[in-house]
Amino acid sequence: MARTKLYMRIVAQRVTHASVTIDGKVKSKIGLGMLVLLGIEEADNEEDIEWLCQKLTKLRIFSDENDAMNLDVNQVEGSFLVVSQFTLHALTKKGNRPSFIRAARPEQAIPLYEQFLKRLAEVSGREVQSGEFGTMMAVELLNDGPVTIIMDSKNRE
């Protein structure tokens, strides 16, 4: 049986503000910037992290003075809020209950998640806030546009 190809997956949303609340307390929040939902798959590695961090930092999804998406997160002095989300790797081909078998197990995913946060801060030079890995969170955001971009680390188009 052929294996479905899934890799580190990101959903990046341009936001005017976003926050993560855990047990009724705000853990982290940002103003203008990007909310990044990060799904880590079993085949992911440091190369995937590097490519995605470089891409996110240079992604021109913010409006310039002519309302054209022409500016990156640095040019608008924005921030990142990164939230781990294994459900981005849901397999829904069979039945009605999603399978998450391809999502990386916590012992592999946590170090990669932490490395992603560190590397994104290094590459971007911007503030990087985060959710809490493996915890039920309430994520609140005001999607600006809306602008929502999906990227897979092995599908580098």
What are these regions (language model features)?
Residues 52, 83, 147:
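Residue-level signal for inorganic ion chemistry
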